C-alpha cells in the first residue's frame, strides 16, 4: 500500500491570496485605524452602511430595464434646477433608509435635497454627517452605461441650530473619509480614511465587498484627458489653449463617459487629467463642491494626485452655500499642473 504524504505546513492556497479574500471592507477600516476604539468602530460601521447602500443601488441598476419606475424622469425639478430622474430619487432614499436607524450619523446632506436630512433621535449618538451624490451620471442609466455614487464623512463639531447646515461650509480638509462606488461590469467601492486609497469589489456570491487593491497610487503623468469638448466655445481662452495644446502633441487620448465617477476611476488607475471648467455663462462650473469635487479631491490627493479649481487646491476652497459649485481640474500631478499653468499665464497676461 502506498501512502501519499502531504505537508501540513504548505497550504493549498497561497496565504496572501486567502488574506485578501478574507479582507472585507469593515475589517479593512479597523486595520487601517489600528484601533478598536469607539471612533474606529463607528467609521467601520458607517463604511459598512455605505456598502449596503451600494449593494441595493447595484441590484436595482442590474434590473433597471426589467422593472417599472426605474428609467426616465419623475417630472420634478431638484434644488439645482435639474430634472430629477427616478433612479436619483431611489438612490437618495436608499442612503437615508440605511442610515436612519443606524445611530451613526445625525444628518445626511445630498445634492438631491435642498437642506440636510436630520435624524433627531440619533443626534445624541451620531457624531457624523454623511454628504453624498446618490447617483452621479444618472443620464447614463437609461442607456445602460456606468454610473456611480460619491460620498464624504465629516465629524459633527458644532451645533446646527438653524437647520441650514451652515456649519458644513468649511474647506475639504475637514473631511475624515471619502470615496465612491462605481457601478459597471462589476461594482467597485474605492475609499480613503486618510491612510491611502483602497478598492473593493462586490462579490455577488458572497454579498461582500472584498479587497481588490491597497494603496493605489495615481501615476504622475498619464495619457488621458477627460472633458466635454462640446463646451469648447463656452470656455475661456486659457482652457481652449490647453485643449489645442493636447490636440497638437502626441501621447494624449480623449476619454469622456458622462459619469464623473467613471472618468475619475480611469484616471486614478491609468493617470491623466479630468477637467470640468467654468463657462462664460457659469464661471463657477457645474460640479458641487461638497458632494462631488471635495470628496474626489480628498481621494485623489491621498493617491498622490492633485485637485484644483485652476487657481488653488480644491480642498482649500470654502463653499459659501450648501450647494456651491466649483470648476474642477483633477488627476495626475504633472497634468493638473500643466492645466494650471495655462490658467495662470492667461491671468498674468490679462492683469499685466
Curated annotation (Swiss-Prot):
Names of the cofactor(s): Mg(2+)
Keyword vocabulary terms for this entry: Calvin cycle, Carbohydrate metabolism, Cytoplasm, Hydrolase, Magnesium, Metal-binding
Enzyme class, UniProt record, top EC level: hydrolase
Binding site for Mg(2+) 1: 111, 133, 135
Residue numbers binding Mg(2+) 2: 133, 136, 292
Cofactor note: Binds 2 magnesium ions per subunit.
Xref: InterPro entries: FBPase_C_dom, FBPase_class-1, FBPase_N, FBPtase, Fructose_bisphosphatase_AS
An annotated Gene Ontology molecular function: fructose 1,6-bisphosphate 1-phosphatase activity
Main location: cytoplasm
Pathway: Carbohydrate biosynthesis; Calvin cycle
Compartments it resides in: Cytoplasm
Binding-site residues, substrate: 136-139, 228, 256, 286
Entries under Gene3D superfamilies matching the protein: 3.40.190.80, Fructose-1,6-Bisphosphatase, subunit A, domain 1
Superkingdom as given in the UniProt entry: Bacteria
Cellular component GO terms, alphabetical: cytosol
Any single GO BP term: fructose metabolic process
Swiss-Prot/TrEMBL catalytic activity: beta-D-fructose 1,6-bisphosphate + H2O = beta-D-fructose 6-phosphate + phosphate
EC number: 3.1.3.11
Family according to the record: Belongs to the FBPase class 1 family.
Subunit structure: Homotetramer.
HAMAP family assigned to the protein according to its UniProt record, in alphabetical order: FBPase_class1 (MF_01855)
Protein name according to UniProt: Fructose-1,6-bisphosphatase class 1
Taxon lineage: Bacteria, Bacillati, Cyanobacteriota, Cyanophyceae, Oscillatoriophycideae
Amino acid at each position: 500500500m502506498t501512502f501519499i504524504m502531504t505537508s501540513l505546513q504548505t497550504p493549498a492556497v497561497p496565504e496572501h491570496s486567502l488574506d485578501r479574500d478574507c479582507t472585507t471592507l469593515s475589517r479593512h477600516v479597523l486595520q487601517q485605524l489600528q484601533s478598536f476604539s469607539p471612533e474606529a468602530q463607528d467609521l467601520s460601521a458607517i463604511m459598512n452602511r455605505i456598502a449596503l447602500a451600494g449593494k441595493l443601488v447595484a441590484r436595482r441598476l442590474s434590473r433597471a430595464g426589467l422593472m417599472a419606475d426605474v428609467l426616465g424622469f419623475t417630472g420634478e425639478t431638484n434644488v439645482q434646477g435639474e430634472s430629477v430622474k427616478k433612479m436619483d430619487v431611489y438612490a437618495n432614499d436608499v442612503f437615508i433608509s440605511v442610515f436612519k436607524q443606524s445611530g451613526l450619523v445625525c444628518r445626511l446632506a445630498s445634492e438631491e435635497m435642498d437642506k440636510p436630512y436630520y435624524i433627531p433621535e440619533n443626534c445624541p449618538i451620531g457624531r457624523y454627517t454623511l454628504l453624498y451624490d446618490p447617483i452621479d451620471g444618472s443620464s447614463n442609466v437609461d442607456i445602460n452605461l456606468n454610473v456611480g455614487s460619491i460620498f464624504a464623512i465629516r465629524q459633527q463639531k458644532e451645533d446646527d441650530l438653524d437647520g441650514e447646515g451652515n456649519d458644513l461650509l468649511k474647506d475639504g480638509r475637514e473631511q475624515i473619509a471619502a470615496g465612491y462606488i462605481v457601478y459597471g461590469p462589476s461594482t467597485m467601492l474605492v475609499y480613503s480614511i486618510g491612510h491611502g486609497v483602497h478598492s473593493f469589489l462586490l462579490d455577488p456570491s458572497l454579498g461582500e465587498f472584498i479587497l481588490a487593491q491597497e494603496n493605489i497610487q495615481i501615476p504622475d503623468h498619464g495619457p488621458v484627458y477627460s472633458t466635454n469638448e462640446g463646451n469648447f466655445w463656452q470656455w475661456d481662452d486659457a482652457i481652449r489653449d490647453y485643449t489645442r495644446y493636447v490636440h497638437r502633441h502626441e501621447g494624449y487620448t480623449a476619454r469622456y463617459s458622462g459619469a464623473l465617477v467613471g472618468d475619475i476611476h480611469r484616471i486614478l488607475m491609468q493617470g491623466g487629467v479630468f477637467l470640468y471648467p467654468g463657462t462664460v455663462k457659469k464661471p463657477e462650473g457645474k460640479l458641487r463642491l461638497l458632494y462631488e469635487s471635495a470628496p474626489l479631491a480628498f481621494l485623489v490627493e491621498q493617491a498622490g494626485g492633485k485637485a484644483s479649481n485652476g487657481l488653488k487646491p480644491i480642498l482649500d476652497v470654502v463653499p459659501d452655500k450648501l450647494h456651491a459649485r466649483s470648476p474642477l481640474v483633477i488627476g495626475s500631478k504633472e497634468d493638473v499642473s500643466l492645466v494650471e499653468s495655462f490658467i495662470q499665464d492667461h491671468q498674468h497676461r490679462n492683469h499685466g
